[in-house]
Amino acid sequence: MAIRGPEASSFFPLTLVFSVGFFCARFFLDRLVYKPLAAYCFSSKASKLMNDEVRQAKIVKFSESIWKLTYYGSVQAWVLLIIKQEPWSLDTMQYFEGWPNQYMTSSLMLFYMCQCGFYIYSIFALVAWETRRKDFAVMMSHHVVTSILIGYAYLTGFFRIGTIILALHDASDVFLETAKLCKYTEKELGASLFFGLFALSWLLLRLIYFPFWIIKTSSYQSIISLRKLEKFPTTLYYIFNTMLLTLLVFHIYWWKLICLMIMKQLNNKGQVGEDVRSDSEDEE
């Protein structure tokens, strides 16, 4: 089923369905799968020497990471399948051509509802569920901006370029959560390998491809297509590009912290430190 851009807004309430669905899925998977799996992974003699508080903290963090890996791995596979099927996906000049009357497939519509629902869920999970970290305020700001950006791209019909943006971002998160799981289970080689892939993907996708291809397309190449309209969508254009630049600021902030982690790893004979994301978790 193909959905014309202006008609897509009628499906937007599905985001709330997905948000509630993620709460339920996380609740049951935590209790039935993730925590039992974590307890099994920390059942070795060495793990049993930890005090109960430390062991429980590791189980909680392990459960968080495997939940995120499940999600990011699934949606990354989904978006890559969408990109493979869409003729416009690799041609940046097509991202805004024919706007606002572009058509989206039902799969792409559901993908957007899923992603927006997940980040809305993540805002509440960050407050009430997940381990509190030192970069809480930055992470909360990121989730809010991302939720708004996904919803905005969908409702305004900028969903083609938005799809590519989501594909770029989820790839890094897959490597990140895998590195965390390796670190929590003391698989140092795996942690170092996936942290390296995480850092490399962050640099290439979020700090090179995102600004020099995606933001360039959104702020410059888009004008070629949008000027064909009777009235240039000035407000929509500036709001969208402002949000993309805000996202880039988050990327630069976290890249600084990733570089600190790289230096820490080099000084630690190649072993990844406790927090492979941003050096923001409390030491355990």
Curated annotation (Swiss-Prot):
Q: How does it sit in the membrane?
A: Multi-pass membrane protein
* A GO term, aspect molecular function: sphingosine N-acyltransferase activity
Chief place where the protein resides: endoplasmic reticulum
Q: Which residues form the TLC domain?
A: 60-267
Per the record, the GO terms for biological process are: ceramide biosynthetic process; long-chain fatty acid biosynthetic process; response to molecule of fungal origin
A family per Pfam: TRAM_LAG1_CLN8
Q: What GO CC annotations are associated with the protein?
A: endoplasmic reticulum; endoplasmic reticulum membrane; Golgi apparatus
Functional description taken from the UniProt entry: Mediates resistance to sphinganine-analog mycotoxins (SAMs) by restoring the sphingolipid biosynthesis. Could salvage the transport of GPI-anchored proteins from the endoplasmic reticulum to the Golgi apparatus in ceramides-depleted cells after SAM exposure.
Name-wise, this protein is ASC1-like protein 3
The upper taxonomy is: Eukaryota, Viridiplantae, Streptophyta, Embryophyta, Tracheophyta
